[in-house]
């Protein structure tokens, strides 16, 4: 299966020209644009190929997190765009699990310090609201809770799907190794990545695609390939961004013929509020 991998297009700052490539599906690992505008662009740009789309942190800016999640799911329903949040989808024998995967803020071992650092530094906690009934802003305790919920949903996914034929899509990074080396020791890096190396080694999905960090990376944790292809901000573009990047994943020979069949969809509805 050929997957067109993109993230962090940040079209709130202007539309990005993405080329048409030959692929079996497109993965957009968050921060396409703010609010619901990214979904509208995706439907125009990729009308004829299955698309797996998740929210990054920027989609939620100016929004209530649960409300936008519900809206995007409803607007994507019945289209070729599969908006997932702690949900999964099977295409051609490859199982995709996707979520924003907020970090646990414990990258350096001390989650309390991470909570303080992220809470005072990250715009996420100033520009995103969490309550559907009131106006409370998102707080670090919320993103830690959401991280734990996503990790538990992923464990349940691995319990019923072959990891060797699975692809994980997240916005936030699963390992410090995705960060540039000169950024790894910074206290705020806990808001960009979690230390899930052991989790990955335990389950060994074939591929893990993420975004959020505007720095391209491609490495392995055990048998798992970890990959990101972010465009970044227009004033600070990622010069290693490859707009036509296509990566291949392998399915069982028995599943290869499914690529020409209608999509088999097994989406688990969002387990979050």
Regions inferred by a protein language model and the residue ranges of each:
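N-terminal active-site segment of His-dependent metallophosphoesterases
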Residues: 1-54, 59-68, 140
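Active-site-proximal loop/helix segment associated with metal-binding centers of metalloenzymes
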Residues: 97-167, 174-183
